[in-house]
């Protein structure tokens, strides 16, 4: 006899093809039994439940390309008893050592039995494994495939096995017929889920694989005493249920951790529309996506109201098969993640068995798999809720999941105490200011950049220009510029390619007391015009410089502007970011010390002068007596030519974007002469970082508004890395939308303070107030 599969079983039939032999859909219940267990009684009870429920005798096949179920004849249940060796079974072993060894043996047997794969075509899809550690110590694993038994059915089976073990003649209620039919109209859910994000972007410990391997782990988490009662009290106060309160807290923790306001979490509907179906065994459960918006910084009470409406909408169409919803919504079918919902919240009583004269303790039924990124399972069988997580091990470490649950439980505690508290306050972390990046201490920086330039150094400063020639030419240019009206705070627009003349121009402008304002030759004409019209002088070439000239006093202070860079910003219009000498001097002193830049180094200048990071490579070397080697733009984009040029110039330090590093790697690798490799301006991927090994590699970060480098991290081969810690003297905060600190592993917005702050957006008086916050010691230790 064959029959068409119900939607849930049909979905698992197709998903099994992607599991690649992993026990992804095993559905075990695991127990530690202390006392004498009757194997005969267990076999008899199992035989009786197999006879009672045809689904336990079902296998799967395809007919005309469609999956079908086939019910087999009544027969003996698959019950196997195995002896479990214990490592400390000797008489000389201490009691504690023997107990530890028995526990380890029990865990190993439970894992092996829970993960034993099923074959949907050949069956059986229901089995019992009993591991005998000692005559009075056993592990019982009741295992089924999810395609035939869902979580509610597993509770039924465990209850029936318990009853029939104690009394095989005990009459049990007729299981009844399975629920009939499903709701095949997803239209209401489409309106609920229209525009929902495809992916929950929780920060991961490793990059998401292109194809899921379904490797997972279960973890049990302690719940504070009395929390269940407090949650129930909050549910009553907000006219909600325990599930709604926990769903609100779960969605809020997911959203604040991921930095997303729009969250979709799936819960599981039992597929049993009434109590008359309580004893039916089968696969009827259906994932129900619930969408929750946490934006606008609601109070927790307001969030509970949102979730209550979301749950009502979802459960009102709970009978619509999940696959139909995914199809109707047009959710992505990306093999790297589950469609539509990558987080689940499940509330369900745990399965139990009761055998006369036997103590029964539940064990975690860990199959070593996970079908979504993170599942939260709340068991409510005791006085306190039990919280268990299942996470994708390819994405998250145990500590990350433990931290997530800690934040979730903290939010629940805070919400119970203050349901009218704003989400930004209730989810605020305890992290304050990031620790500075470790490295050599920098000498106290002079108050202006000019005081740092090593004009008296021997050797070449830039290209073939010596330090002595650089000093004379920049001083002569300063005299010429001052005569043209370029003094303190006056802008000098510079339209020069990177090279020796550009270095002379920058220092000449500063020695005149003026402000360096670079112009990018490739800018659109309107933008170039806007910048040059604001300048007192426009420098398109180095003029003929006098042999004799009167040296000028720059007349600058640490707070005088050193340069102005133009960023397009969100409006597309150029914003003038003015940075004072103090910030540039401090940054160069700390960053050059951090990477050990010295007089023997040659630094490649490869970045467009329109970007502030060019200052580091054009001026930074001059503060330590090193040499600048300018690389023409056409060579920078030609990997083989770039490698040859770096070797010809004997370059030892390179600071470029990952895009340029990739050009070098593709051309055969970075020349060995480059001992320090700095990535800046773009995201450095682990793959590219691995290709840049064999030398000192730094990943750095810093917006124009905070002077080139704000944070840095030394990248070691094979290690996990980020943007690093702040440079000494930089205050770095990670804050939420309410300007409160966030914890580790939580997405927030970086706020930077300390010495490197720009003066502001020049000519835009409103911008500094919005983006440069005048906060004085906002947090303890800040």
PLM segments and residue spans:
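Conserved AMP-binding
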Residues: 496-499, 520, 561, 597, ...
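Adenylate-forming
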Residues: 10-19, 28-36, 46-48, 62, ...
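Gly/Ser/Thr-rich phosphate-binding loop
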Residues: 623-626, 651-655, 665-722, 731, ...
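Conserved AMP-binding/adenylation subdomain of ANL enzymes
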Residues: 575-602, 612-652
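AMP-dependent adenylate-forming
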Residues: 321, 346, 538-554, 584, ...
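Carrier-protein-dependent adenylate-forming modules in NRPS/ANL systems
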Residues: 1-173, 204, 228-229, 257, ...
């Amino acid at each position: 006899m064959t029959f068409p599969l119900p939607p849930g079983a049909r979905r698992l039939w197709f998903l099994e093809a992607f599991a690649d032999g992993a026990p992804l859909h095993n559905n075990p219940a695991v127990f530690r039994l202390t006392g004498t267990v009757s194997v005969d009684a267990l076999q008899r009870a199992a035989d009786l439940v197999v006879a009672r429920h045809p689904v336990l005798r079902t296998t799967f096949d395809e007919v005309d390309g469609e999956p079908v179920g086939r019910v087999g004849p009544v027969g003996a249940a698959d019950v196997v008893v195995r002896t479990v060796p214990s490592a400390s079974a000797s008489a000389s072993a201490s009691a504690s050592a023997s107990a530890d060894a028995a526990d380890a043996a029990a865990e190993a047997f439970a894992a092996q039995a829970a993960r034993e794969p099923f074959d949907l075509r050949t069956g059986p899809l229901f089995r019992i494994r009993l591991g005998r550690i000692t005559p009075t110590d056993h592990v019982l694993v009741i295992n089924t495939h999810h395609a035939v038994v869902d979580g509610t059915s597993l509770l039924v089976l465990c209850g029936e096995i318990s009853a029939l073990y104690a009394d095989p003649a005990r009459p049990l209620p007729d299981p009844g017929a399975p629920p009939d039919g499903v709701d095949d109209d997803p239209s209401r859910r489409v309106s609920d889920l229209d525009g929902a994000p495809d992916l929950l972007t929780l920060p991961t410990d490793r990059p998401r694989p292109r194809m899921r391997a379904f490797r997972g782990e279960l973890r049990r988490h302690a719940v504070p005493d009395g929390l269940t009662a407090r949650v129930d009290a909050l549910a009553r106060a907000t006219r909600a249920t325990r599930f709604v309160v926990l769903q609100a807290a779960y969605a809020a923790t997911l959203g604040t951790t991921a930095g997303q306001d729009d969250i979709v979490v799936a819960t599981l509907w039992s597929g049993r529309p009434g109590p008359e179906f309580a004893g039916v065994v089968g696969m009827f459960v259906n994932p129900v996506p619930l969408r929750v918006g946490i934006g606008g910084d609601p109070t927790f009470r307001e969030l509970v109201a949102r979730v209550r409406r979301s749950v009502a909408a979802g459960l009102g169409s709970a009978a619509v098969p999940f696959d139909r919803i995914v199809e109707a919504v047009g959710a992505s079918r990306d093999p790297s993640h589950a469609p539509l919902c990558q987080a689940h919240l499940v509330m369900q009583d745990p399965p139990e068995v009761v055998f006369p004269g036997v103590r029964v303790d539940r064990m975690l039924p860990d199959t070593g798999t996970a079908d979504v990124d993170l599942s939260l399972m709340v068991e409510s069988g005791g006085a306190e809720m039990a919280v268990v997580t299942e996470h994708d091990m390819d994405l998250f470490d145990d500590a990350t999941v433990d931290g997530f649950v800690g934040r979730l439980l903290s939010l629940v505690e805070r919400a119970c105490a203050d349901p009218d508290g704003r989400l930004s306050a209730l989810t605020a972390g305890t992290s304050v200011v990031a620790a500075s990046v470790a490295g050599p201490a920098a000498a106290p920086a002079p108050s202006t950049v000019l005081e740092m330039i090593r004009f008296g150094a021997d050797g070449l400063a830039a290209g073939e220009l010596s330090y002595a020639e650089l000093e004379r030419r920049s001083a002569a240019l300063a005299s010429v510029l001052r005569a043209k009206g370029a003094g303190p705070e006056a802008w000098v627009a510079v339209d020069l390619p990177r090279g020796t003349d550009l270095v002379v121009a920058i220092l000449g402008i500063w020695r005149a007391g003026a402000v360096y304002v670079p112009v990018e030759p490739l800018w659109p004409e309107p933008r170039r015009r806007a910048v040059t019209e604001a300048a007192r002088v426009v420098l398109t070439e180095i003029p003929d410089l006098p042999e004799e000239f009167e040296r000028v006093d720059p007349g600058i202070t640490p707070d005088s502007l050193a340069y102005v860079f133009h960023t397009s910003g969100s409006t597309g219009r150029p914003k003038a970011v003015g940075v004072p000498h103090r910030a540039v001097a401090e940054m160069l002193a700390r960053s050059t010390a951090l990477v050990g830049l010295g007089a023997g180094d040659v630094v490649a200048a490869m970045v467009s002068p329109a970007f502030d990071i060019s200052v580091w490579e054009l001026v930074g070397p001059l503060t330590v007596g090193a040499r600048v080697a300018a690389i023409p733009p056409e060579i920078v984009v030609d990997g083989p030519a770039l490698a040859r040029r770096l070797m010809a110039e004997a370059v030892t330090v390179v600071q470029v974007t990952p895009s340029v590093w990739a050009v070098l790697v593709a051309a055969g690798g970075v020349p060995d002469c480059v001992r320090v490799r700095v990535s800046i301006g773009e995201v450095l991927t682990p793959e590219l970082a691995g290709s840049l090994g064999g030398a000192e590699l730094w990943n750095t970060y810093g917006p124009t508004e905070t002077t080139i480098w704000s944070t840095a991290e030394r990248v070691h081969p094979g290690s996990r890395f980020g943007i690093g810690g702040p440079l000494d003297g930089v205050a770095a905060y990670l804050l939420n939308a309410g300007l409160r600190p966030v914890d580790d592993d939580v997405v927030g917005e970086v706020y930077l303070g300390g010495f490197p702050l720009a003066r502001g957006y020049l000519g835009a008086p409103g911008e500094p107030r919005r983006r440069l916050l005048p906060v004085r010691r906002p947090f303890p230790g800040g």
